[in-house]
Amino acid sequence: MVTVSTAQELADALAAGAQDIEVRGAINGAPGFTLPPGTRLHGGTLQFGARGVRLTSDNTLEDITILTADEEAAILNDTGVADLGTLTLRNVTTRGQIVILAEDRVRAGHVQAENVRVITADVRGRFHRPHGFGVDALQGGFTLWNRQADPEVKLTAELLDISAGTEAQPVYGSGIFVGGHGDQDGHGDGGTVHVTLLRTGEVHTDGAIPARTPDLISGGVFVISGATVDVVQSTGPVTTYGPNDMVLDNWGSVGTWTATAAVTSHGPSGIGFVNFGELDTLDVRAPIVTTGNGARGFNLYDGTLRDARFQSIRTTGDGSIGIQISKPMGRLAVDGDVATSGGEGLSLVKGVQMTLKAIALSITAGGSVDALAIGGKLASGGTNVVTLEVEGRSGEVSITGGVEATGTGSVAVSIGDDAAIDLEGIDIRSPE
């Protein structure tokens, strides 16, 4: 092991081919450098003015802090390497983006990340953005992305305890971004990423997208098309602050997604959880709260979903639907209430700003629910809104606290001519 404490000593160690380098203290002003294959770098703090550490193959970064400008990449990879081997990040803190890409010559690799924290980053200026469902998506402070069109190119990963941003300094862009190659419709059609476990800590993001922009979004935790994640565990609170900032978003394929801490959106046209991809089981064991106009709680826009359970969902903005189901799904359960307090307002829908009303639960003509169980109540408080709107179908229904509308000109239930739902025995309350 070689110990270094100055930029020159670090450069000398790299030039000499040292395979195990310990940084003692803080090294400021070093130019960005490439870590040779098989090299381990650990300890201390590195301060850069531009790009930081470029990984090649079988590298380890451990117990280290890497700082650069928010707009730069603190950790990136050499895309001229065919096989990344195993890139290990353990107990790593950065200011600036962590970005691992499969492009150019990269065709394989595994990423093992444990206790990784991006203090803040600004990725709004990145040229490459995945596109789907009428929008581009901003990269994340932590980004793992297979951009190769060839489906034979495969990355794998285990990502444990990844955090991004703070309440005082959110990441500008998405937070944690995992994706493969997708087509313009948002469906995977090339290189893939397979993650066995994605476990996230605290995440704070602000895409800083101008209000009413129709074709750009970000996500706090974002599984992009071309990514398969066996298990997602959102163990820390995830909060987004700006327009079009989704909190939890799936375009890919996820086995089980569990959230055990608050899911919160403070910007217009944000969504607590939105699904466009394949998702077997969703279990949100903490409140979903949105406060912006057009900011929905949960939306099954597209794809598949077998089972979803929520603790509670509350929206306060105009046009902020609590739950909207636009595709067939299995069981939908909410332990507590689904409550909205807004009226009519604009909301982003697949790349178009549309006028919506703050319905508590909407099952559209293309949507269906095999079994619906609400442990609390469905409630709306806005003017001229509907609490429960059904144009599709629902199987067995249980709403323990009933369906309630309290706003002027509002009604508790609206059922379309071709809809199918049995509300017998359920308490329905509309304003007199």
Question: How does the language model describe each region?
Answer:
Residues T6-L10, V99-I100, M246, I321:
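Leucine-rich repeat
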Residues M1-R24:
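Acidic Gly/Asp/Thr-rich repetitive segments characteristic of extracellular carbohydrate-active
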Residues H42-F48, E62-A74, L89-I100, E114-Q139, ...:
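Beta-strand-rich solenoid/repeat architectures in extracellular/passenger domains
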Residues A15-A16, N28-H42, L46-G85, G96-V106, ...:
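Extracellular beta-strand-rich solenoid/capping regions of secreted or surface-exposed proteins
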